[in-house]
């Protein structure tokens, strides 16, 4: 199975992807240990998260962070009853890339 570039994402898809990223941020912030690690890696302070969460690039970074930590990704996906791959789909949508599977 290969991937090919697909159509650009639609506005509704982008809003859904950003909502998933906000949910991921809430999940990370839901436990002090998770939040502390995120803040340490991102270099942000807790006071700047709320403003940063309004920026697409920050939300993209949240999804990258989540995708890079498989146990965290799986826990987030399970809590939100979504497949783990939905995080990368949302990431690609926010980044302006939309991928579709090639069908034989």
Positions of PLM-derived features:
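Metal- and O2-centered redox machinery and metal/ROS homeostasis
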Residues: 1-104
């Amino acid at each position: 199975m290969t991937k090919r570039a697909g159509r650009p994402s639609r506005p509704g898809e982008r809003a859904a992807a950003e909502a998933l990223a906000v949910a991921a941020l809430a999940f990370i912030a839901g436990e002090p240990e998770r939040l502390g690690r995120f803040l340490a890696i991102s270099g942000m302070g807790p006071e700047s998260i709320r403003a940063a969460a309004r920026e697409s690039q920050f939300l993209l970074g949240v999804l990258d962070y989540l995708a890079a930590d498989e146990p965290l990704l799986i826990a987030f996906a399970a809590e939100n009853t979504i497949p783990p791959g939905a995080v990368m789909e949302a990431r690609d949508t926010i980044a302006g890339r939309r991928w579709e599977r090639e069908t034989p």
